[in-house]
């Protein structure tokens, strides 16, 4: 492979990257995100931005429990091909993680931090969430493992109290379990609908539904303190409440269900054990209060059994129901009126707002009119007179233009009507053949002209297309810049391949030389071994053999001295080239620094020019 002169020992040029302020800001934000997430290698100043960003993305992916096929050991100064292969592996894992942002390998390799930032932000968020989930899982697993082998004092205390608590709860359930108070008679009417069956079953256990709150409280007091006989329970009613006819019908239905029931034999006419215990445990004042309440209830029940009292109560309930209906109607009417009031109030507010806008616009017009009058009073009267005259002339010309257009339109309609009449007359008289021939000839002539013009237009369009293609073949500045970047990348790849191939050739030549020397050594040893016994047979042959050995040793020493000398020369040349390389690197750094300072000065110059233009304008 042929390498251009002057570039054989030159380091591969790096790919140009966007180094504007926005890219630098995004790079700083990416590094701050990675450090905040726990990737502290991003603080190392010796690493390149590519190594920091790619390392951070790889760390986030592995933290999220996703596998990525990369080398375990860190490799510095990777080639373009190695970087692209690494970025392709990273990008291939992102769809598996269901990343909502798209990213291409060349964007990572080209350090396009604007497009890399959303992906890194999402990866850091996902890594933190995964770490929290793993922390919760490890914490719960640790607690479970601890609980398998150890116990806290609270756990021991709970285990000691557990059996006693279970026994207490069981006893409470046994004491307060539902007790059947009534039983349906055998000859009672059969209940058909399911809801009535449910109510009847609940009534058998003393559960009454459909009463008011006051009635429910009275029943609870009766259940807790005393159990009345079945006749009193069937006749018991709540105090009059403000309910409608449906509630009265519900009470009537419950009473009907109660008529088909009889009290249980074990509880008829006596108190339950729990009620007796409660009464005994109460004080004397409470016992007196219970007796008075029982007397009041008994008097109310006896009063309600009278038919004349029953009619008055029913009439009172109906009046209350009708009044409730009237209250509901008035309430609905009030709500409708309130809604209309709110609507009218909104319209009034909107009208006031419109009025305010109109008044402000009127004031603005008045101010402008006053300003115009002021200007008119200050202006020259002759100029104003000329302006008024010109405005009048303009208006007059506009009106004349409208009249002329209307007159032309009428004239055109009249002429078209005349043409139609003439055509009709000519068709009747048969005198239009000669004009038709002239018209056809003129039409054919114009048609041929049109065809020629179209041919010329097509030829001109072809010429324009050819010129356009030639213009398009010349690359623009952006395309040339892109080509230059791609050529630099290709050159870097070719240079790396050339360097690698050169190393292989050097290694091959070294091994080949080593092989030649080893073969010579083996042949020499074999020759010595074969001729040793024959040379030792006589003194003359022995001396000759020793002289030959000395000559061979001398030749080997000379070859060794030559190789050492060549090695020293190569080493000196390497040191010299290394010094030159370091000088070139220093020049390159100085060049990049100068370019950066020049860009900064250009930016400052542009800002000053823009400020100068703004101040001058």
Curated annotation (Swiss-Prot):
On the tree of life, the source organism's domain of life is: Eukaryota
Location in the cell = Early endosome
List where this protein forms a coiled coil.
Answer: 285-474, 546-614
Q: Which InterPro entries match?
A: CCDC93, CCDC93_CC, CCDC93_N
Which parts of this chain are annotated as the region Disordered?
A: 1-20
Quote the biased-composition stretches of kind Basic and acidic residues, using this chain's numbering.
1-16
Alphabetically ordered keywords of this record: Coiled coil, Endosome, Protein transport, Transport
Q: Name one Pfam family in it.
A: CCDC93_N
Biological processes annotated in GO: Golgi to plasma membrane transport; protein transport
| A single Gene Ontology CC term | early endosome
Q: Does the keyword Protein transport apply?
A: yes
Kindly indicate whether the keyword rRNA-binding belongs to this entry. no
Q: Which family does it belong to?
A: Belongs to the CCDC93 family.
Query: What function does this protein fulfil?
Result: May be involved in copper-dependent ATP7A trafficking between the trans-Golgi network and vesicles in the cell periphery.
Q: What is this protein called?
A: Coiled-coil domain-containing protein 93
């Amino acid at each position: 492979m042929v390498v251009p002169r002057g570039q054989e020992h030159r380091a591969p040029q790096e790919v140009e990257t966007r180094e504007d302020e926005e890219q630098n800001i995004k790079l700083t934000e990416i590094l701050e995100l990675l450090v905040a997430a726990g990737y502290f290698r991003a603080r190392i100043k010796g690493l390149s931005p590519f190594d920091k960003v790619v390392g951070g993305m790889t760390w986030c992916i592995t933290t999220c429990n996703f596998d990525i096929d990369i080398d375990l050991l860190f490799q510095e100064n990777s080639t373009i091909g190695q970087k692209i292969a690494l970025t392709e592996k990273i990008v291939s894992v992102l769809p598996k993680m269901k990343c909502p942002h798209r990213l291409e390998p060349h964007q990572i390799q080209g350090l396009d931090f604007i497009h890399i930032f959303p992906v890194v932000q999402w990866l850091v968020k996902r890594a933190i969430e995964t770490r929290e989930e793993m922390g919760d899982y490890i914490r719960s697993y640790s607690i479970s493992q601890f609980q398998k082998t150890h116990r806290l004092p609270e756990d021991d205390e709970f285990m000691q109290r557990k059996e006693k608590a279970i026994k207490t709860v069981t006893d409470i359930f046994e004491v307060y379990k539902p007790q059947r108070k009534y039983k349906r008679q055998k000859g009672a009417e059969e209940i058909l609908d399911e809801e009535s069956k449910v109510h009847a079953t609940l009534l058998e256990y003393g559960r009454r539904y459909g009463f008011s709150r006051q009635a429910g409280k009275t029943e609870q007091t009766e259940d807790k303190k005393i159990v009345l006989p079945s006749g009193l329970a069937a006749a018991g009613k709540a105090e009059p409440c403000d309910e409608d006819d449906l509630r009265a019908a519900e009470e009537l239905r419950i009473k009907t269900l109660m008529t088909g029931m009889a009290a249980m034999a074990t509880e008829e006419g006596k108190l339950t054990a729990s009620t007796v215990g409660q009464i005994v445990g109460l004080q004397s004042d409470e016992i007196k209060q219970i007796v008075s309440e029982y007397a009041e209830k008994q008097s109310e029940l006896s009063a309600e059994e009278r038919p004349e009292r029953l009619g008055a109560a029913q009439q009172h309930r109906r009046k209350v129901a009708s009044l409730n209906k009237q209250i509901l109607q008035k309430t609905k009417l009030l709500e409708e009126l309130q809604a209309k009031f709110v609507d009218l109030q909104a319209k009034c507010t909107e009208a006031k707002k419109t009025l305010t806008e109109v008044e402000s616009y009127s004031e603005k017009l008045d101010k402008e009119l006053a300003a115009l009058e002021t200007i008119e009073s200050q202006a020259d009267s002759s100029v104003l007179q000329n302006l008024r005259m010109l405005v009048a002339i303009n208006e007059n010309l506009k009106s004349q233009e409208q009249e002329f257009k209307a007159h032309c339109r009428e004239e055109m309609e009249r002429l078209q009507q005349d043409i139609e009449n003439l055509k009709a007359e000519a068709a009747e008289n048969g005198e239009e053949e000669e004009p038709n021939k002239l018209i056809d000839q003129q039409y054919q002539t114009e048609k041929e002209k049109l065809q020629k013009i179209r041919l010329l237009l097509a030829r001109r369009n072809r010429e324009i297309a050819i010129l356009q293609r030639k213009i398009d073949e010349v690359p623009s500045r952006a395309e040339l810049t892109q080509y230059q970047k791609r050529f630099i990348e290709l050159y870097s790849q070719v240079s790396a391949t050339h360097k690698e191939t050169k190393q292989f050739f050097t290694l091959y030549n070294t091994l080949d030389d080593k092989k030649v020397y080893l073969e010579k050594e083996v042949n020499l040893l074999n020759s010595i071994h074969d001729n040793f016994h024959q040379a030792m047979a006589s003194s003359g042959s022995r001396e000759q053999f020793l002289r030959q050995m000395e000559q061979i040793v001398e030749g080997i020493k000379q070859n060794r001295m030559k190789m050492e000398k060549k090695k020293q020369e190569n080493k000196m040349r390497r040191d010299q080239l290394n010094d030159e390389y370091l000088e070139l690197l220093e020049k390159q750094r100085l060049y990049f620094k100068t370019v950066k300072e020049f860009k900064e000065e250009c930016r400052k110059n542009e800002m000053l020019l823009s400020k100068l233009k703004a101040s001058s304008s």
